[in-house]
Amino acid sequence: MARPLPILGGILLSFSPPAEATVQYSIIPEPSRTELKQETAKTLQLLSDQEVPTLGTDAYRLTVTPQGAHLASGGREGRIYGLATLRQLLDQLAGQPEGIPCGIITDKPRYPWRGLMVDPARHFIPAADLKKFVDMMAYYKFNRLHLHLTDNQGWRLPVPGYPKLKSVASRREESFGDGIPHEGMYTKQELKELVAYCAARGIEVIPEIDMPGHNQALHAAYPEFFCFPKPDMNVRTTAGNSKELVCPQKPEVWKFYASVFNELKDIFPSGIVHLGGDEAPTELWEKCPLCREARTRAAMKDEQEQMKAFFEKTAALLAKNGQTPQFWYEGNAGIYHPGETVYAWRQDQALQSIEKTKKAGLNLIMASSEYCYLDFPQIQGQRNWGWMKTTTLQKCYDLDPAFGKPEKEAGHIRGVHAPVWAERLPDLNHLLYRAYPRACAIAEAGWSPMGVRSWENFRRKLADHRQF
């Protein structure tokens, strides 16, 4: 007996399609293999739904006949993806009463990791809105939702024993001088419900607790965690970073992070904790008497060795819980350990990151900002911080996560990841407007083999998805 189709979202796009006469499937991301038949199907009733383990856990085969559809899947993930394809065909059929071609779709993802990141730290996203965002992700076969829960502008994770995270760190006076207070924090129950909602749609949730920097909101709540406490510190109201890093020589810092990781373990079953690790200026560590004494005692030559020691201690805390770390890759491979996973994000450094991480024995997720940062302007004239490149839909589509490298040089690449940073995205509508349709291009970059990808065909499909 086939189970009901999951409830998934639609999308509104705006652009002109290329001229195209032949009726084809409009599936995004493009399947690995499609065989079209001469017959036409005017119904897509699911006639059979079978598990065929030999296909592979995340693979499926969907056969469209004049009488209806037959789904074979290798496992739970493959079934979810097959149903997502069937949902897209149902939407296509709704706009084509004359029918769609019969055929056989044999499909599996190119990469195991296909993620989007949202940024509730900068602008809080209510849990109900996150679920709407997740529906869109499932429609396009994304399988990782990355929650950037903490930053200079807000802290969104409740931690027992630390009430000022809610009363202080989750609130700011305004955003960019607008005079409007902003606040928000998830409850533990909301996050657990989100995890379950995502799991039902084949999506794993990855929490991020940024450290040792990007912590001005934490400093406002608990200044004693920092090298030079500033009791008058406020949660940041603009974009940008601060110089404040948590002090690794203070026991209360490690007690706090142990509590944070315990809470994450109870909420997020993935066991993965993204630790940030990016944009952490060490000048205050250099000046801090406690840090200087620790470097002398351990014969550390500089603050970068102290950074390595910081993350070694953090990783040890995680290991006690059976958790594993991930990081934004900063190019210094010496900070990370073989087998760990990093995200290549820095602009114009993708090839360099592929080569360095391969030599260091690291797993790499491609999130290169000039292709994958969906908060970047889509067209000239949209809001720009000055350093952002205009990232058009075609630029996103042009991404090959391996950059043409053979398997022996790029086999450590686990997939693709597109962040949607939210300094200027105050609500779900703004978030979706920035993310789509470019997220559709990222979905295809992560799922479809290069040999079946075509920009012109992608444009044709998007025109149909506008009607969905």
Predicted features along the sequence, with ranges:
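Bacterial N-terminal signal peptides
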Residues: 6-14
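Flexible, acidic glycine-rich loops studded with aromatic residues
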Residues: 325-330, 335-340, 344-468
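Catalytic domains of carbohydrate-active enzymes, especially glycoside hydrolases
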Residues: 131-152
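Conserved, mostly hydrophobic/aromatic
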Residues: 75, 116, 137, 205, ...
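Active-site neighborhood of glycoside hydrolase catalytic domains
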Residues: 236-237, 242-339, 347-350, 354
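An acidic-aromatic substrate-binding cleft motif
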Residues: 102-125, 132, 138-140
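Aromatic- and acidic-residue-enriched carbohydrate-binding clefts of CAZyme catalytic domains
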Residues: 109, 153-200, 215-255, 283-305
